[in-house]
Regions:
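Short acidic, glycine/serine/threonine-rich loops at helix termini
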Residues: 1-2, 21-26, 40-42, 61, ...
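Glycine-rich loops and low-complexity Gly/Arg-rich segments
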Residues: 9-13, 35-38, 52-55, 169-172
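Short alpha-helices
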Residues: 24-65, 73-85
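N-terminal small/polar loop signature for handling phosphorylated ligands or for N-terminal nucleophile
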Residues: 1-24, 28-31
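Hydrophobic helix-and-loop "lid/oligomerization" segment in the mid-to-C-terminal part
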Residues: 58-175
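Alpha-helical scaffold elements adjacent to nucleotide-binding pockets in ATP/GTP-utilizing enzyme cores
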Residues: 2, 48-52, 101
Length: 175
């Protein structure tokens, strides 16, 4: 409401059931809207944003949707997989594809903060940036990584987790 009152277009993304009036926004992207024909209703919030990014990339680059999905997956499938698992969404249909691809991306991740977090819990004992010593599984994400990521928001600020995923500094990630 604050941004809208100042003339800023707002796009709301969500994945929860819609109850009552939708927010006053330029767009409300939610597969669970009663008027939404999208067939898969069980995307996590991060999955909704992923689909929105794919649509933007298709339009922005003027490329076929499958090419846009490949580009966005290459950059973000790891984070979308973590978010989908952490949100305890059912791992079927689109979520299954996103998580399967994302887990493989995590195994070869160059994200400094994600590598530091995985190293901190002992999944990659040699500390190298080579492929993981063990396969990364949804169980590992759900029971080991996700609680640590969520703890930042409960103990201090969720911004700490965001900073961890965005940093290029191993020293900062290890702190």
């Amino acid at each position: 409401e604050h941004a809208h009152a100042r003339g800023v277009d707002v796009v709301v993304t969500d994945h929860h059931e819609c109850h009552g009036k939708l927010p006053d926004a330029a767009a409300v992207v939610n597969p669970r809207r009663p008027d939404c024909p999208y067939p898969f209703k069980e995307l996590a919030g991060v999955g909704v944003v992923f689909k929105l990014l794919c649509a933007f990339e298709t339009k922005r680059a003027g490329i076929p949707e499958q090419d846009a999905v490949r580009r966005i997956c290459a950059d973000y499938a790891d984070l979308v997989a973590i978010g989908t698992i952490a949100d305890v969404m059912p791992i079927r249909d689109e979520n299954r594809l996103i998580v399967a691809f994302g887990l493989r991306r995590i195994e070869h991740s160059q994200r400094v903060g994600l590598c530091a977090l995985i190293d901190a819990v002992g999944k990659r004992p040699d500390g190298s940036r080579s492929p993981r010593a063990q396969r990364i599984t949804s169980g590992f994400i759900g029971y080991t990584l996700a609680p640590r990521i969520n703890a930042a928001g409960r103990i201090s600020s969720a911004g700490l987790a965001v900073e961890l995923f965005l940093t290029d500094s191993r020293e900062k990630a290890d702190a």
